[in-house]
Structures are given as C-alpha cells and as structure tokens.
Amino acid sequence: MSPVAPPPAPPRLSLQTAAIAPDTTALRSLDWDRSRFDIEFGLRNGTTYNAFLIRGQRTALIDTSHAKFRESWLPQLQSLIDPRAIDHLVVSHTEPDHSGLVADLLELNPDLEVVGSKVAINYLEHQVHRPFRSRAVKSGDSLDLGCADGGTSDHRLEFVSAPNLHWPDTIFSYDHGSGVLYSCDAFGLHYCSDEVFDSDPGAIAPDFRF
C-alpha cells in the first residue's frame, strides 16, 4: 500500500500596518506563497495587496484585500478604526485583490459611500448583490476629507481616470494633503516583503517584469 502523502502546508498569509504619511496608514496583506497571478504571471516571491486608511475630518479607505484574508484582515481593520466610522471606500478597480472584501465591509457599515469609476460601480453592483451608496468619479473630480483634529494636512483626493491600466475601471487617487499618489497597479510589481518601501532596487529587479 502506497504511503499517503501529507496534506500541503497552508499558504503563508500575514498582515502588516504602517504609517506612510500624515494621518495615513497602509494595511498590507502579504501573500508569501502565491505562485501565479492572473494565470499568465509566474511569481517567485509572492505578492502583496495594499489598502490605505486616510483620516481627515472624514475618513476614507482606499481598497480592501483579497477574500483569502477575510478572517484576519477585517479584525485588523477593526483594531485601527470602527468600520462604521469610515465615510468613503475608494475602489481603485474591481480586481479581486482590491475589492475582495467590499461586500464584507458593507455588512459592517451599510452607510458607507463607495467611490469609483462609473465602470467600477457597475461591476460592484453585480459583485456585492446588495444596494449601496455610491459616487462615480472621473478625472478632475475630488473628494474633500478635510483636516484631522490636531492635524496639519488638509486631505483632498483628486481622481484620475486610467482605464486599462490595467483594468477598464481603474482610477488613481492623489491626496493633495500628503502628496501621495495611490496609483492602483500602474507602477506596482509582484514582490512580497516586510519592507514597506522599496528602498533596495536590486532586491526587486528580477521581479520587475511582473
């Protein structure tokens, strides 16, 4: 009788939060063992899904995470903020690693306003299967979050339509208060690391083509 092979080890998934700008926290979902992305990309160093929490007088969350992080990502978000205190969810595009937990977030905060391109809002209506408040934006539109109590940065998100970089519903968000451009996937690559910033270009060079 042939020996029974042991079950495969569960994938390594971890979370990291880091302050990256005034009143701004990155929520990083680290998918260490992912070996393929969008079928055609073979990955050597996993990948990372990023969301960003911006607190002014009003609060915005840019993107969520992949559904595989549901059990850990939502509690991590709740450790940072009561989801009912989030006013706006900006969806950069509806690829599953950006929008995989939108429905879960709407369960926690049904009054949340979802902000995205007209195409993204249409896609989400078919993904979450429930009514939700929404705002369709295009290049030149903006969302004023104001200045956090005790803060010095007046956060205003200006949107840039970027269809087919690399999905048809993509938008960029530029925060005039912090000077941060949230560029969706336009300048990203698949590389999983504990380092929040790519301070060593040599480390990521072999993966840059992905």
PLM features per residue range, with description:
Residues 3, 8, 12, 19-22, 151-210, ...:
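Metallo-beta-lactamase
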Residues 1-11, 15-22, 177-178, 196-210:
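Accessory terminal helices/loops
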Residues 104, 126-129, 192-196:
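Short acidic, glycine/serine/threonine-rich loops at helix termini
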Residues 62-64, 85-94, 114-117, 161-162, ...:
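Active-site neighborhood of phospho(di)ester-bond hydrolases with catalytic His/Asp-centered motifs
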Residues 17-79, 172-175, 180-183:
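Conserved beta-strand hairpin/beta-sheet module of binuclear metal-dependent hydrolase folds
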Residues 57, 68-115:
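Active-site metal-binding motif and surrounding structural segment of the metallo-beta-lactamase
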Residues 3, 37-42, 65-68, 90-93, ...:
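Short, flexible loop segments at the rims of nucleotide/cofactor-binding pockets, characterized by
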